């Protein structure tokens, strides 16, 4: 499964996301004049790495609606959905793990992780199929269904969906017929639930570390984590953190 394009589904006031991936002639000229070839290559690589398509979601009707807006850009191929407020870091890319599971099962795949039962109201929660065995050391799990943000007493498992999916194009038909659900939104989980009656759906436990960068604490934690692993600033960050901890 080879990705040739990135489809950004955005809304009003989010041009900065589009601009980030666009060419930056002024910045490139500045870096070239300074002789900063290393950073010049990085800036140019961002705009050259993939074909970028932007789609506007004019109404905020949920994740399922956002995915449906990308239908014409995606076409009739399987595709990945990546939510930017979930950052997963590991030796092996989390999305690559999902793609492997998709190619093995020829179905749709959702990324999952264990969550406290009381947190079920914040996640889509999966229902495990007890009649089919898990594979790959228990990391790839056949599913019977999904429920969006159930009450703890109603949650079918303690596995919550993280913001990574690989879906077949059949999902678009289901999204078109999906009624507004939780929060009066078109829920992607409801459409995947309908899809489960026709093709395999599996959950995939990721092997890395996950950060919720949609929260202030998660955003700060993710930045510190990535800074500590950075080849240029990691050493200085560790020294500074050690010094701060000793002060306290």
Description of each model-found segment:
Residues 16-17, 191:
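Phosphate- and divalent-cation-binding pockets in alpha/beta enzyme and binding domains
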Residues 1-2:
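Short, small-residue-biased leader/transition segments that mark boundaries at the very start
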Residues 27-32, 37, 43-130, 167-169, ...:
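Conserved beta-loop-beta/alpha segment of the NTase-like Rossmann-fold superfamily
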Residues 19-25:
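Glycine-rich loop at the start of a catalytic domain that most often binds anionic cofactors/ligands
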Residues 237-248:
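Intrinsic disorder at enzyme termini
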Residues 7-10, 112:
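Short internal beta-strands
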Residues 80, 95-103, 131-238:
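Catalytic-core segments of class I nucleotidyltransferases/pyrophosphorylases
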Residues 11-14, 21:
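Residues in the short beta-alpha loop(s) of Rossmann-like NAD(P)-binding domains
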